[in-house]
Design a protein with these regions (language model features):
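Transmembrane beta-barrel strands of outer-membrane/channel proteins
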Residues: 2-12, 50-54, 88-94, 127-133, ...
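Repeated loop/turn-to-beta-strand initiation elements of outer-membrane beta-barrel proteins
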Residues: 2-4, 44-50, 79-88, 114-126, ...
Length: 310
C-alpha cells in the first residue's frame, strides 16, 4: 500500500520585483514546479519513498535558477532496541539535482521518552548519524576529484501543541566534509573582491544548518465532499553556519519566512482528493548574511493537484 501525490505549483512575481534588481529581491519569479511524490510500503517494516521535481517558465524569460531534482530513499524499520522504547531504522537515500548524493542514515527515534500530555505531544525525536558521498559537484562531469566525503548528524524534533499549533526543530546537517582536492573544496579567506575568479582553496570544512518552525493549521469549512483549511509555517528556513568562508563573508546566514495559505479540497472518493491552494510566502530571498539580512518581500503562489491512496 501507499500513496501518490501529483501537484503543479505556480510562483508569481515577488513584491516590488519590477522596481529593483533581481539580486536585491528574488532571482526566482514567474515559474512553475511539477512534483510527483509517493510512498510504497513494500512490507510492514520497509518503505520506498520517491519525489520528482521539474521546473518550467511561466513567461518568455528563464526566470528561475533551480535544477530538476530526483529524491529517493528506502527505509527499513528494525523495531525497538532490546527492551527499550528507542526505535531503530536504516535509510539509504539518493538525490540527483546538479550533482549526485548517496547517503546512509542510522535513525534512532526517542519519541516514546519525550512529551505526551495535554499541552505537548512529541511525534518524532529522531537522531541520525550519517555518511554521504557526493560526486559531480557543481555539475562538472570531467573531474574525478570533484567529490565530497561527509560524515555528520541529522536530528528532528516534532511536536503537536494545542489549538492546531505545532513546533518543529530540524538539524538538517552537522557535517564534516573532506573534498577531493582544494580546487573543488570551499573558500577559506579568499578575497573575492580582489580576485573574483579565485579557486576554492580548502579541501575540508565543517558546517551546520538548522530549521525551526512554528506551524498552525485550522479547518475553516467542511462538508461531506468539500473542506477548506488554513495552514502557515513560520520560522528559520534555515539558519546555517560554515567554518570556512571567503574573506569578510559571514560565517552565519539565515532565511526567515512565513507562508500563509488556504486550501480547498474536494473529496472525490474515499481514496482520492482533488485540491487547489492559494497563498504567499514572505522571506528575505537574497540578503541572507546574518549581519545584513533584509529585503523581506511577498511572493504569491498557487497549487493544483491530487492525492490518492492505495
Amino acid at each position: 500500500n501507499g500513496y501518490v501525490y501529483l501537484q503543479y505549483r505556480m510562483y508569481g512575481e515577488t513584491e516590488g520585483q519590477d522596481k529593483v534588481g533581481g539580486k536585491n529581491w528574488n532571482e526566482n519569479n514567474n515559474y512553475g514546479r511539477l512534483q510527483l511524490e509517493g510512498t510504497i510500503n513494500t512490507t510492514e517494516n520497509q518503505t520506498f519513498y520517491y519525489r520528482l521535481r521539474t521546473y518550467d517558465s511561466l513567461n518568455s524569460d528563464h526566470s528561475w535558477d533551480k535544477d530538476d531534482e530526483l529524491k529517493m530513499h528506502y527505509t527499513v524499520n528494525h523495531g525497538n532496541l532490546g527492551d527499550s522504547k528507542v526505535n531503530f531504522a536504516s535509510r539509504v537515500q539518493y538525490i540527483k539535482d546538479i550533482d549526485h548524493a548517496l547517503r546512509y542514515e542510522a535513525r534512532f527515534d526517542f519519541a516514546e521518552y519525550m512529551f505526551n500530555n495535554d499541552f505537548i505531544k512529541t511525534t518524532e525525536m529522531v537522531v541520525a548519524p550519517y555518511y554521504e558521498y557526493t560526486w559531480n559537484r557543481d555539475g562538472v562531469k570531467s573531474s574525478g576529484d570533484n567529490y565530497d566525503n561527509e560524515v555528520g548528524l541529522y536530528a528532528y524534533f516534532g511536536n503537536q501543541l494545542p489549538y492546531g499549533f505545532g513546533f518543529n526543530v530540524e538539524l538538517d546537517t552537522l557535517g564534516f566534509h573532506n573534498y577531493g582536492d582544494k580546487t573543488h573544496g570551499v573558500y577559506d579567506g579568499v578575497d573575492l573582491k580582489a580576485d573574483p575568479e579565485a579557486k576554492k582553496n580548502s579541501d575540508s570544512n565543517t558546517d551546520a544548518a538548522v530549521n525551526i518552525y512554528l506551524t498552525y493549521g485550522a479547518n475553516l469549512y467542511s462538508s461531506e465532499k468539500v473542506s477548506v483549511d488554513f495552514w502557515a509555517e513560520t520560522g528559520y528556513d534555515s539558519y546555517s553556519w560554515s567554518d570556512k568562508v571567503a574573506k569578510d563573508a559571514d560565517h552565519e546566514k539565515y532565511e526567515l519566512k512565513t507562508d500563509p495559505q488556504v486550501t480547498l479540497t474536494y473529496h472525490a472518493t474515499p481514496t482520492l482528493d482533488l485540491y487547489a491552494t492559494a497563498g504567499a510566502e514572505y522571506r528575505n530571498w537574497m540578503r541572507t548574511n546574518e549581519r545584513s539580512a533584509s529585503n523581506w518581500r511577498w511572493q504569491p503562489f498557487g497549487i493544483v493537484g491530487f492525492r490518492t491512496t492505495f
